[in-house]
Amino acid sequence: PGEFTTAINDPKARKELIQQIIAFTKEYKLDGFDIDYEEYDNWDKNFPSLLVFARGLYLAKEKNMLMTCAVNSRWLNYGTEWEQYFDYINLMSYDRGAFTDKPVQHASYDDFVKDLKYWNEQCRAAKSKIVGGLPFYGYSWEESLQGAVDAVRGIRYSGILKHLGNEAADKDNIGKTYYNGRPTIANKCKFIKENDYAGVMIWQLFQDAHDDNYD
């Protein structure tokens, strides 16, 4: 396990980590802090300690400190206790099925909607807490783009436009390159607004187009 997982599984280290996070937030006059735990191996074993850690932070923080989290969208069990400690829950509604050899849409509109409903209906989080995640990147299985992608086939939206042309802006895939174009991003935002969810978050802004006409 990583150092963070080791710390939250040790009561003494967990207490010290909580104290340091609160102290850091105060010292630098931050609005709050975010938990983004992505060590998914042995989830069922480590999640109880993560829940205790979240509760400890919640009890230790000042009332005006924001406490947020980034969570896996739907395939890990957070239960119904997790949501109570957070002001906002940011759903990482992307990367679904992306780390395989099979070309796939990693962030479909349908999955986005299912993720939001899952956290509201199954995890009991209020809509006013739930934030839908939007990817400003995609994945490509095209041999011709292997020099443009990263180690896991990821490619920025700006890179997609650079290599596939500006017409890609209004599509969700070209060949074996999958991403979210402008219409899908707009439709996701529309669903958020019309159904009274908290809002959207972006991963991440620097991956956007460099031309205002296509961002």
Which residues does each PLM region occupy?
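Substrate-binding cleft of extracellular glycoside hydrolase catalytic domains
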Residues: 1-41
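Second-shell loop/turn segments in exported
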Residues: 3-11, 38-45, 101-106, 174-178, ...
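Conserved, mostly hydrophobic/aromatic
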Residues: 35, 89, 132, 192, ...
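Glycan-binding loop/region signatures in secreted carbohydrate-active enzymes
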Residues: 127-193, 211, 215
